[in-house]
Amino acid sequence: MDQYPIAASSLEKYYHINGKQFERQYKDHLSGYRDWEAQEGAHAERYLIFPENIGPRLSIDETSLSDGELYTIVTNKDAHGEKGAIVAIMAGTKAWDIAEILWLIPLELREQVEEITMDLSPTMRKAARFSFPNATLVADRFHVQKLALDALQELRIRFRWDALDEENRKKAEAKATGKDHEPEVFENGDTRKQLLARSRYLLFKSAEKWTKSQKIRAKILFDHYPDIETAYNLTHRLRMIYAKSKTKGIALPKLALWYNDVEKAGYESFKTIAETIQANYDQILNFFNNRSTNASAESFNAKIKSFRAQLRGVSDVKYFLFRLTKIYA
């Protein structure tokens, strides 16, 4: 349990022990928790820092430990989510609060950080800029792409609601005249509302990855909803800019053209991503320096969630932080 994120209850089957009793014994006598609680534990629920784990490439992300309470966690990419991964874990997501805690790490160590990846949160950006003066800030490509995908799906959903309203109107008209309502059926067997519902997954994929039935459905969808086709092409182009551009110099003009085309399209759902790109232009382009993403932070976040699930929730946050840092810091 010192080295692996497991619950004491998971040992019952293999060692024929009482899991709850062993958990208490581990917490009170075997783990060193009580000594830790009297020292580092005094401020554990506010922050824990591990300056020795700092490295040139860091990630910063937020995670929920218990009851939706958010913590900010800084991790070292080179630890690959294992021992030595956690550099700092801090309660809350306010930029100034995070920076004040990170300043407890000696400046000469913070100056060694060359690059830090993050999502598109302005809070994370401010905290990183205040704390790591020599670091290049990189906006995670997958968060940018997700904004475009969300905008595309928002457009599809709006058309689906329109289709549902239209079908309900026609049903009411048919009922008023004593006739049965026969919905429009396309050549693949989908009704209009089914077409818009069943197209959800194909819009997430590149056209070359569509199955035969998805290709047929996409053609029908795009023939009847050219706005969805335009939005899909914009989303796909953004994906290709990230996938094919090898340098910042190549990506910059492509991204500028893409931004102009988004503005010309005029879709309300794409306004958010246009504004986000404008606000984070430098951080977005910094991806093309080393093609660094925040995937390591997302992966580490998933490990925390899995550990929390094994424990069936976190009733004692301080003890959970003790175990988490014992394993990963």
Regions found by a protein language model. Give the residues of each.
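The DNA-recognition helices of helix-turn-helix-type DNA-binding domains
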Residues: Y15-N18, H29-Y33, E40, L120, ...
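A structural signal for short, well-ordered beta-strand segments and their strand-loop junctions
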Residues: E12, S59, T117, L137-A139
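RNase H-like nuclease fold core
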Residues: E23-E115, P122-A127, N134
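Short, amphipathic alpha-helical "recognition" segments used to contact nucleic acids or chromatin
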Residues: M1-I6, A243
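Short, basic interhelical loop/turn and adjoining N-cap
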Residues: I6-K27
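Short alpha-helix plus adjacent loop in nuclease-associated cores
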Residues: R141-D165
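Acidic/histidine-rich catalytic cores and adjacent linkers
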Residues: D67-G68, K77-K83, E108-N134, F142, ...
